[in-house]
Amino acid sequence: HKIALFITQTGGGCRASNYIHLLRKALEKADLAFVPVISVNLSGLEKNPGWTLTLPMIRKMIYAMMYGDLIVNVANQVRPYELNHGQTDRMVDDWQGKLIDGFQTGKGMSRRQMRENFDRIIADFDTIPVSHEEKVRVGVVGEIYVKFSPLGNNNLEDFLLSEGAE
């Protein structure tokens, strides 16, 4: 058994604070109770015996969030306008693979390498042919799970794209 599930927790009053308990319950129901669910938080909400959050782990997590934010932002700006349907998603998959390989080998973990990767990511997405038509811009607000999970929002993003919205 070489797997664990990490989830961030803020301890706030939103539904996300319950996710850790729901994940554990789901794992038990699936006969996977041996998989530890580790709370990543800075407020001491839970103790995780046998595991310590180290500075290199924190650094990788921060870099992963920054890479993820950049890719989501550029993909969301390009996808509604792409001329070749699916090209943005293929680019996301390609960069996801490159970054996973980089994280495993330690590449892309310096500020200089990250900056270079940021420039490459932006340049690659910029090669995707797009239309310059004006589209209605829609912002989805609300609870984080509902905003970002197709299951939680009944595939809202796909619906909005099919209706010609950004």
Ranges and model annotations:
Residues H1-E166:
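An N-terminal assembly and electron-transfer interface module characteristic of large anaerobic redox
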